[in-house]
Amino acid sequence: MGKVGNIEHIEERAETELMPPSMYKVILNNDDYTPMDFVIEVLQLFFNKNEQEATDIMLAIHHQGKGICGVFPFGIAETKVAQVNQFARQNQHPLLCSLEKA
């Protein structure tokens, strides 16, 4: 009988541990200096966007001030933000990538 109680407890605990992770939007913010071609390159390189998808997102960034590159679990989103910001600085562009909870 004690085993049944333990099994129920383990099953209940396993269910609570399987909650989906919080998701975060990775966002590129518009600026007046970063070339559109560089933004397209970033979208293709870091977010696996094809030419048309990258162009559409770049135009949204240009016209709306920001654009969503993708939605990811926090750890992945945080890594992509850091990679994009580092790549932009290495290429001497002020492009800013950020994240916000989805």
From Swiss-Prot:
InterPro entries: ClpS, ClpS_core, Ribosomal_bL12_C/ClpS-like
Superkingdom, taxonomy of origin: Bacteria
SUPFAM superfamilies per the UniProt record, alphabetical: ClpS-like
GO biological process, one term: proteolysis
Pfam family name, one: ClpS
Similarity comment text for this entry: Belongs to the ClpS family.
Functional description taken from the UniProt entry: Involved in the modulation of the specificity of the ClpAP-mediated ATP-dependent protein degradation.
Subunit (UniProt): Binds to the N-terminal domain of the chaperone ClpA.
HAMAP family: ClpS
Protein's name in the database: ATP-dependent Clp protease adapter protein ClpS
Taxonomy of the source species: Bacteria, Pseudomonadati, Pseudomonadota, Gammaproteobacteria, Alteromonadales
